[in-house]
C-alpha cells in the first residue's frame, strides 16, 4: 500500500475465496486473475499473497502462466512461506512455480532476527532487475545493520548444513500433532482436507488453525495464555492461529497437545451442562458471525478515489457508526495480520460496519484509525 501511494498507482482488487466451514480466507482463483486482466488490459503487474497467514496456498503456477500470457509479471508476497521448498511435506515455493518476484520474511518462519527479509528475482523474470536495485537503493537504509545481515547469513548456513535433517524432524512432529487432534471433539483443526475448494490449491500445515465449537479466538487465546502459558500468533473472530517453525521442539508440541486436550474436555462439559435447559445452547463465534449484520464471506469494497487522492484529500471526522456511504480517508484493520477491512479511497459499506461491530463484540482490537478507540473515522469531505 505504501508503494501504491508513492507511485499513485491505480488498484484493481483481487479477492480471495471464502472458506465457510472454518471461517477463513481461501486462495485466489486463476480464473479471477484471467477476468481481471481482460477487464483491465493496461494492468502492469499482479500481486498476490501465498501462503496466507492461515496457510492457504493459491495455484501460483497457473496464475503465473496467465500473467505471462498477458505479458506481465507476477509478484508473490510469500512473507509467511520462507520455509517452503525445503521439505516435500510443505508446499512448493512460488519461485519454483513461475513467479517473477517473490518476497520472503526470514524472521517469520526461519531462525533469524525480526526485520530480516529477502526479495527473490527469478532468472526468467519479466522485470528490470537494474530498476529493482535502483529503487532498493532509494528506499533502503544506507546504514544497514550488520547484526541483521550476519543473522541472515547464519540462517542460510543453518539451512545448508542442517536444513534437511531439521525439516524432516519438524514434519514428523507436525504429523504426530495432526494425528493427535483427530481425537478432539470440540476443537476443529483443518488439514489437507481443505485443499481443492475455495481457491485453496495447497495448504501449509505449519499454520495450525484452532476452531473451537463454542466461544471465539480471543477466548481461546486467553485460555492458553492464562492457564497454559502459551501465546497464540493471532486471535481472530472464530478461531486462533498457532504458528510453528523448524525451531519448535517436541516439548513445545506436547505442551500444546495437553492444553488443547484440557480445553476440549472443558468445552464438552460446558455443552453437556446446557443440554436440557430451555432455550439453552452453546453458540460458536462462527455462528455469531454468520448472523452478524452484513457478514457473509469476503467483503468487496468499492474503490472510488485513488489511495493517494484519499490520503491527501481534505477530510473531516465523523462517528464510525454513522459513516456508511462515505469515502474512507484511513485504513481500518485487525492486527495481526494487518490486512485492511477498509483502505483510503474505498466507500464505507454496511458490510464493513457489520464486521467491525462483530469483531469489537468479540473483544478484538480495531486498528489503523487515528482514533485509537475506533469510535470515529476520517472521511473525505467531498464524495459520497
Model-based region annotation:
Residues 369-383:
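Terminal helix/beta-alpha structural elements that buttress the NAD(P)+-binding lobe
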Residues 119-121, 210, 244, 379:
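Hydrophobic side chains in beta-strands
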Residues 277-281:
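Intrinsic, low-complexity polybasic segments
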Residues 175-276, 286-368:
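Conserved C-terminal alpha-helix-loop-beta "cap" of PLP-dependent enzymes
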Residues 1-193, 212:
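Conserved PLP-enzyme active-site core in the AAT-like
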Amino acid at each position: 500500500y505504501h508503494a501504491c501511494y508513492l507511485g499513485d498507482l491505480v488498484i484493481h482488487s483481487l479477492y480471495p475465496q471464502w472458506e465457510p466451514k472454518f471461517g477463513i480466507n481461501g486462495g485466489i482463483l486463476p480464473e479471477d486473475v484471467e477476468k481481471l486482466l481482460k477487464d483491465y488490459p493496461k494492468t502492469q503487474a499482479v500481486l498476490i499473497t501465498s501462503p496466507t497467514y492461515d496457510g492457504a496456498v493459491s495455484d501460483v503456477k497457473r496464475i503465473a502462466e496467465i500473467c505471462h500470457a498477458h505479458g506481465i509479471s507476477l509478484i508473490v508476497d510469500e512473507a509467511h512461506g520462507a520455509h517452503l521448498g525445503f521439505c516435500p511435506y510443505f508446499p512448493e515455493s512460488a519461485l519454483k512455480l513461475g513467479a517473477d518476484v517473490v518476497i520472503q520474511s526470514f524472521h517469520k518462519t526461519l531462525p533469524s532476527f525480526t526485520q530480516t527479509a529477502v526479495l527473490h528475482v527469478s532468472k526468467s523474470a519479466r522485470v528490470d532487475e537494474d530498476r529493482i536495485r535502483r529503487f532498493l537503493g532509494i528506499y533502503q537504509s544506507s546504514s544497514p545493520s550488520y547484526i541483521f545481515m550476519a543473522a541472515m547469513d547464519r540462517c542460510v548456513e543453518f539451512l545448508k548444513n542442517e536444513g534437511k535433517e531439521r525439516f524432516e524432524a519438524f514434519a514428523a512432529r507436525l504429523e504426530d500433532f495432526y494425528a493427535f487432534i483427530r481425537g478432539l471433539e470440540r476443537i476443529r483443526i483443518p488439514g489437507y482436507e481443505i485443499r481443492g475448494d475455495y481457491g485453496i490449491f495447497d495448504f501449509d500445515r505449519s499454520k495450525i488453525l484452532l476452531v473451537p465449537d463454542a466461544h471465539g479466538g480471543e477466548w481461546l487465546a486467553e485460555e492458553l495464555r492464562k492457564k497454559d502459558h502459551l501465546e497464540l500468533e493471532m486471535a481472530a473472530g472464530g478461531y486462533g492461529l498457532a504458528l510453528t517453525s523448524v525451531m519448535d521442539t517436541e516439548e513445545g508440541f506436547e505442551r500444546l497437545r495437553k492444553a488443547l486436550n484440557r480445553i476440549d474436555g472443558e468445552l464438552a462439559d460446558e455443552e453437556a451442562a446446557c443440554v436440557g435447559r430451555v432455550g439453552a445452547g452453546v453458540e460458536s463465534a462462527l455462528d455469531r458471525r454468520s448472523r452478524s449484520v452484513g457478514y457473509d464471506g469476503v467483503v468487496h469494497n468499492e474503490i472510488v478515489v485513488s489511495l493517494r487522492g484519499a490520503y491527501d484529500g481534505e477530510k473531516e471526522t465523523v462517528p464510525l457508526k454513522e459513516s456508511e456511504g462515505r469515502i474512507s480517508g484511513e485504513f481500518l484493520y485487525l492486527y495481526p495480520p494487518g490486512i485492511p477491512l477498509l483502505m483510503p479511497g474505498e466507500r464505507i459499506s454496511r458490510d464493513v460496519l457489520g464486521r467491525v461491530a462483530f469483531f469489537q463484540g468479540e473483544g478484538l482490537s480495531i486498528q489503523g484509525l487515528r482514533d485509537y478507540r475506533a469510535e470515529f473515522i476520517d472521511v473525505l469531505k467531498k464524495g459520497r
